[in-house]
From Swiss-Prot:
GO BP of this protein: thiamine biosynthetic process; thiamine diphosphate biosynthetic process
GO MF, one example: carbon-carbon lyase activity
Catalytic activity: 5-amino-1-(5-phospho-beta-D-ribosyl)imidazole + S-adenosyl-L-methionine = 4-amino-2-methyl-5-(phosphooxymethyl)pyrimidine + CO + 5'-deoxyadenosine + formate + L-methionine + 3 H(+)
Binding residues annotated for [4Fe-4S] cluster, in chain numbering: C566, C569, C574
Co-factor remark: Binds 1 [4Fe-4S] cluster per subunit. The cluster is coordinated with 3 cysteines and an exchangeable S-adenosyl-L-methionine.
Ion transport among keywords: no
Protein name: Phosphomethylpyrimidine synthase
PANTHER family in the cross-refs: PHOSPHOMETHYLPYRIMIDINE SYNTHASE, CHLOROPLASTIC, THIAMINE BIOSYNTHESIS PROTEIN THIC
Binding annotation for substrate: N224, M253, Y282, H318, S338, R339, G340, D379, G380, L381, R382, E418, Y445
Record organism: Sphingopyxis alaskensis (strain DSM 13593 / LMG 18877 / RB2256)
Quaternary data: Homodimer.
Length: 630
């Protein structure tokens, strides 16, 4: 455990640390790009028992240096700047003085910072910005035919280092996607140029490991973290970020709304190997004391620049909540449930004006392309109950998001589209179809959707069902839901449950889409299960710790790890053990010609007796006199 300075959490007897070290049964590896460029991509290999004769299973890894035993983790220093040289080598950025941090950035902390958290010790004095007239977005490079190191990294990462993915099992229904057998850097470039994929990669977040979000790539997941006005602890937030990426979160959104927003975000960004997203309107609202009506374009613009200079990779912008759409939500069961959507709806009604986000959208886009920040166009009118699913308000906003997508693409800025929400199973595909139509195949990023409203405490399951379905239909990234959804802020355990549930949904979607090699891990686990390789079963699972814990609740002895049964059926009724015995028996019969002949004769005799049974009217034990014997 690498401890964060104890000053970050004065309420704890011992300082909170971040989890480090390899995931059980796995090792960190670095795979060289096949182009010979020197780019090395981090992955994870799950090691199997030597006696099995099976090779390691390679899996996508989001955990960054935290699972590398050779890495030195110092939270106060931050992570190595993987992309720094790539960014500067392009020659289109300049250094500028970072905007001065103000009290309102941290929730009106005074000059003495009382009630605040320590500032990150190594805050940059200079930050990067595009040179005047330049555009530093990955989409801009892609449309000029340039394959960036980020695109090359993504290609190697998506292939998991395999040279011939088509050799693996591929079976599924892709609903019109264009998933290749093998991902090349040119394929990545083309997908980004078309707007069908994004690589969130702010030039001021060089610590991030490039990843792609798009329907023709592996389905990704996002984890939300963040403090609130009633719960703020930067150490816990950094730990939740590290914990969530350990279990598979591809991106993390910092949704902080309380005090210390700026400083908390700095700690997270400097220690995050995955893209970080935010909802800037939350911080802007804090700057006006929580009064939505007092928001202005100038305050919002300043907040965007503040976060852009820190390195936020994508912004949720609720520019689709327009004044004419607000009355459409009035007849809903649950009205407007999006925080950002409700803030903008209130502002529109108070001023009886069009949203300043919509009016100034092109100016926002100018900021985005100067730092390579991707849009995550917010669904402020998403349904908050299945009764409101697929209604007029939801789809009116969706078509506006399509219009805004085209405006952003006109300036070569990357875009993904946020989606619902609460949608019953039979209405899910309509959401995907309309999004593809309205938004030109821009990546879809959905919260679930939750398929029923009756399970508070289990909404990671109600939403996991919808997430697997919509991921199969084409959603590129799934925003996790934890068991605490609708009930409270998730803690560390809730974050893990949410992430693992959504990794399951994303993987199920990859299988259903027929993604090359998606089934390799499933087949390896199935084989380990049939061969009673218990440790391999644990290690191949999404959550090895919980799998072994459940096994050990009834069979904790070390010998049980090699036993040919579990506590479900016991040694005499294990179906797989019996199947193995049947296999061995059949194998022996086939090897022994006399035994094979005897088996054939026995089968012939059984067929004859079966016919007698049919001929006698299916009566049992018929005697010579035609009477049934007792």
């Amino acid at each position: 455990m690498a401890d964060i300075d104890s000053r970050l959490d004065t309420t704890q007897a011992t300082p909170i640390g971040v989890t480090t070290g390899p995931i059980r049964g796995s090792r960190k590896i670095h795979v060289a790009s096949p182009t010979g460029s020197g780019i090395r991509v981090a992955m994870r290999e799950i090691l199997l028992e030597p006696s099995s004769g099976e090779p390691p299973v390679r899996v996508y890894d989001t955990s960054g240096p935290y699972t590398d035993p050779d890495a030195t983790i110092d939270i106060a220093q931050g992570l190595p700047e993987l992309r720094a040289s790539w960014i500067r080598a392009r020659g289109d950025v300049e250094e500028v003085a970072q905007r001065e941090v103000r009290p309102e950035d941290n929730g009106q902390l005074g000059p003495d910072r009382s009630g605040g958290v320590p500032a990150f010790p190594n805050v940059r004095k200079k930050v990067l910005r595009a040179k005047p007239g330049a555009n530093v977005s990955q989409m801009h490079y892609a449309r000029r035919g340039i394959i960036t190191p980020e695109m090359e990294y993504v290609a190697t990462r998506e292939n998991l280092g395999r040279e011939r993915l088509a050799e693996y099992v591929r079976d599924g229904q892709d609903w019109g996607a264009s998933i290749p057998d093998y991902v090349t850097p040119e394929f990545v470039r083309d997908e980004v140029a078309r707007g069908r994929a994004i690589i969130p990669s702010n030039i001021n977040h060089p610590e991030s490991e490039p990843m792609a979000i798009g329907r023709n790539f592996l389905v990704k997941i996002n984890a939300n973290i963040g403090n609130s006005a009633v719960a703020s602890d930067v150490a816990a937030e950094v730990d939740k970020m590290v914990w969530s990426i350990r279990w598979g979160a591809d991106t993390v959104m910092d949704l902080s709304t309380g005090r210390n927003i700026h400083d908390t975000r700095e700690w997270i960004l400097r220690n995050s190997p995955v893209p970080i997203g935010t909802v800037p309107i939350y911080q802007a609202l804090e700057k006006v004391g929580g009064i939505a009506e007092e928001l202005t374009w100038e305050i919002f613009r300043d907040t965007l620049i503040e976060q852009a200079e820190q390195g936020v990779d994508y912004f949720t912008i609720h520019a689709g909540v327009r004044l004419p759409y607000v009355p459409l939500a009035a007849k809903r069961v649950t009205g407007i449930v999006s925080r950002g959507g409700s803030i903008m709806a209130k502002w529109c009604l108070a001023h009886h004006r069009e949203s300043f986000l919509y009016d100034h959208f092109d100016e926002i886009t100018e900021i985005m392309k100067a730092y390579d920040i991707a849009y995550s166009l917010g669904d402020g009118l998403r349904p908050g109950s299945i009764a409101d699913a697929n209604d007029e308000a939801q789809f009116a906003e969706l078509y506006t998001l399509g219009e805004l997508t085209r405006r952003a693409w006109a300036q070569d800025v990357q875009v993904m589209i946020e989606g619902p929400g609460h949608v019953p199973m039979h209405k899910i595909k309509e959401n995907m179809d309309k999004q593809l139509e309205a938004c030109g195949e821009a990546p879809f990023y959905t919260l679930g959707p939750l398929t029923t409203d009756i399970a508070p405490g289990y909404d990671h399951i109600t939403s996991g069902i919808g997430a697997a379905m919509i991921g199969w239909y084409g959603t590129a990234m799934l925003c996790y839901v934890t068991p605490k959804e609708h009930l409270g802020l998730p803690d560390r355990d809730d974050v893990k449950v949410g992430v693992v549930t959504y990794k399951l949904a994303a993987h199920a979607a990859d299988l259903a889409k027929g993604h090359p090699a998606a089934q390799v891990r499933d087949d390896a686990l199935s084989k380990a299960r049939f061969e009673f390789r218990w440790r391999d079963q644990f290690n191949l699972s999404l959550d090895p710790d919980t799998a072994e814990q459940y096994h050990d609740q009834t069979l904790p002895a070390e010998g049980a790890k090699t036993a040919h049964f579990c506590s479900m059926c016991g040694p005499k009724f294990c179906s797989m053990k019996i199947s193995q015995e049947v296999r061995e028996f059949a194998k022996l019969q086939n090897q022994d010609s006399a035994g094979f002949i005897a088996a054939e004769e026995a089968e012939k005799g059984m067929a004859e007796m079966s016919q007698v049974y049919e001929d006698t009217g299916r009566e049992l034990y018929m005697g010579a006199g035609g009477r049934e014997h007792d």
